[in-house]
Amino acid sequence: MNALRLLSPAKLNLFLHITGRRADGYHLLQTLFQLLDYGDELYFEIRDHGPITLAPALPSVDFEQNLIIRAARALEPYKPKPLGVDIQLTKRLPMGGGIGGGSSNAATTLVALNHLWQCGLSKQQLQTLGLQLGADVPVFVNAQTAWAEGVGESLQPIEIPPKWFLVVQPDCHVSTAEIFSHGDLTRDTAAIKVAAFLERGGQNDCEVLVRKLYPQVDEALNWLQQFDRHARMTGTGACVFASFDSVEKAQWVQTQLPAHLPGFVAKGVNQSPLYKLLPAS
């Protein structure tokens, strides 16, 4: 095999609790990463020799700083032959939306090139490389909906009943660094067990602050909560979502969206397509 076409899926944080802060400044979290059947698409075609190429280039991102390129570079020391690769990106997910676009692209690249270049790295090794690229990359390498703790690196795969989600994209870019460094952020939520979340749910500890700082997010949530009172923000935003028991209901609500609020409907899945490509050990 010398080529692969893969979905690079989005994720949602079904809840996000900040339970503390380590001495090094990193926040301790609890969250449930829900993978979706919607995302970007990446096509990889191996070259017998030559460089790593990516098309199209993202105009706002330096080539070498693109997470796709950084992931490919991280694997280069492990490839047994001097192979290159041409990568084509079909971008559907917004940048800075809190739904994991860049992190998912990096994870998809790690898993795909480990397979195509025959690098022979284990899933754990790929996750370790991924963590160097971003805190959310390991969950996409893991390729399973998962309960996460610590700084997001402790992952417990979890199977939950399928839901349909309407994800809405407010017209703003939320700075994760700004939110996590803000003095008003809640950092002392009590830790909960999986069973407690499944019974009673949770909240997003970043949401109150983001709604105050970004009126576009507040507006989008106010609109969505007409249809789902549990609608909430994912990650540090800006995207927000509502869940439904049927695709028909999700699509109907999508048709009611105001013209200035784009959105998409996706199904929650317990595994992404990457799962079948992961090494056995």
UniProtKB/Swiss-Prot annotation:
Keywords: ATP-binding, Isoprene biosynthesis, Kinase, Nucleotide-binding, Transferase. Its EC number is 2.7.1.148. Gene3D superfamilies: 3.30.230.10, GHMP kinase, C-terminal domain (3.30.70.890). GO terms for biological process: isopentenyl diphosphate biosynthetic process, methylerythritol 4-phosphate pathway; terpenoid biosynthetic process. Pfam families: GHMP_kinases_C (PF08544), GHMP_kinases_N (PF00288). The active site is at residues 11, 136. It catalyses: 4-CDP-2-C-methyl-D-erythritol + ATP = 4-CDP-2-C-methyl-D-erythritol 2-phosphate + ADP + H(+). ATP binds at residues 94-104. One of its GO terms (molecular function) is 4-(cytidine 5'-diphospho)-2-C-methyl-D-erythritol kinase activity. Pathway: Isoprenoid biosynthesis; isopentenyl diphosphate biosynthesis via DXP pathway; isopentenyl diphosphate from 1-deoxy-D-xylulose 5-phosphate: step 3/6. It is an enzyme of class 2 (transferase). NCBIfam families: ispE. Belongs to the GHMP kinase family. IspE subfamily. Catalyzes the phosphorylation of the position 2 hydroxy group of 4-diphosphocytidyl-2C-methyl-D-erythritol. This is 4-diphosphocytidyl-2-C-methyl-D-erythritol kinase.
